[in-house]
């Protein structure tokens, strides 16, 4: 049967299908299970790639790994034979990897954004996988900084499939433009249909639905004078498990059958191939746009404002730890723990990832599944916070010992202080129990990129009063150990912090 709209179409010559799984860390399954599933999807995609290898070129199956986060975890546990199999089909262009670590909210700090691209370097250095494209799905935008960072590491194409539910798409839509970063680095950006478009909106995989749904979109593009492309580009996931879904064997058979019976052909391609096509055939027709692509309705972070605030504070505390350790390193006193820091950044980032709650969280908020998903999501924030406080407390104690050592600086006011201190159980005079801290020198770290006015309160002298660890950070002045502080007044100073 001839596709009934073909004879009327002068513009659209091909339908391109990018098949992938949408990465939700949570929502459909417990977070740990999601990581395992995306590794399984790689194996299933390779099975389907091999199974369709004798199909016509357009219907040979292709798969794009949407995010590097779960993929890196898969590679860590994969056998050498599994890795070799992946590399074989990657080199043949049948399976691809996009460069973003996860689908993100706007919560990431600059350091997180940079670290989120570390997997790109790991994949290139350790596996010879050279990533040239990145994609985001189900969000409304990403930080302007990514236009800069992606281009700096050799990624020249960025695709986004905006979630249209209360989400405003930039223009052109659908369409491409050159996204220029803050320092005028450029990357080609495609602002396309939602990732459910292929399976849900035009019914790919089921001819009955496609015949009914596809014509409306084709006609709209045919009659849109601002649409300057000869193709329809569709992202497509699993028809049932639209999020965290596996490859669907029916897609290759559907494309093969469609092409045998229609003049308007369909073809699988990866996100990198699509970016290359835009670069070669359409770049000279693209307009340049500058500015932040703001994701403006992230309801999730607002629904858990305490944990969101906690995680944002952890961003800054971890930078304070890094600054303190940098000073200690100069004097060969550093206890820098790169593995622990890497783990903390990963947990902070997994809280800032775009998935909030379970799919049951509205209808069944008290269910085991809803509670388990939220427990893990919030755990990312709490774990990162506690581990950061522990590192910072230990690092700060080392720094305090360093600057209070007369061998380090005998002119320091703190040089006369004793690290041991006095533990008061009510048997000391007030002047002994609450000595003057004599803190004429304070280290205050500004983790923000601009000058600000602050009020500093002199810390209480309690050397050795608490274990060297997290308790140091949360020990309050009014704690019952020794009672209130009646003897020495608390001094405060207002200053500008550069």
Stretches found by the model and what they are:
Residues 1-498:
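Carbohydrate-active enzymes and regulators
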